[in-house]
Amino acid sequence: DPRYQLHGTDALRDWMQERADEVIAAMADTHFDIPEPVRTIECLIAPTQTGGIYYTGPSDDFSRPGRMWWSVPKGVTEFGTWRELTTVYHEGVPGHHLQVGQTVYRRELLNKWRRMMCWTSGHGEGWALYAERLMAELGFMDDPGNYLGLLDGQSLRAARVVLDIGVHCGFEAPAEVGGGSWTYDKAWTFLRAHSNEGEEMLRFELNRYLGWPGQAPSYKVGERLWLQLRDEAQQRAGDAFSLKDFHRRALDVGSGGLDVLRDAVLD
């Protein structure tokens, strides 16, 4: 479908920037308090060629803004946006950029280590998955193609959990890939069956989770906690509940363990 196609890396970079800027304009002062320095994000094509999108935080004084990078595999010049809009929300706004940028900004609340160095996967990646779901709830993914991209991402993340736990805890592989002990080839077949990502991206994902035990489940555990926190905060506050106030209070905690986050937000 040409509606979801981009041609060339310049068009890809511009599309990323436009999506990020429009969300900042829509979200600031409505669903989020976004400090002025955090309202700038720079979207770039990464020098690496591994596939995927990632985020790097701003400098302490925001002279270098937060940046969202797309690592384009060598030779790839055509891009489908239907799968990637949800990833832009994950890595950019209201995902990692808002989360990390606000933490860096809160120097009156957090020490330098908490602002610039601390990262807990369940907290950070859980927030980014929560951000994806929030954007769907707010109507930003009502287009069927873009919503299909959200579901495709959820399928991959669920498959990664199965792979991570199965490989690192010694469980048998599913019957669909032959059962028995997990092997690289069985893991590859399993990922291919449960995601529409390109080969370069899936190879990157497979190598990542073979060598990083526990990271894949942390995404989903963290997402579940963020959703539970919001629901519980809303139940306690009733009609006085403010989504913007909830987000500000939760993000002001900075990165930390999930128990710490729960206690700080609900106590």
Functional labels for PLM-detected ranges:
Residues 1-267:
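Long, His/Glu/Asp-enriched segments that create or flank divalent metal/ion-associated functional microenvironments
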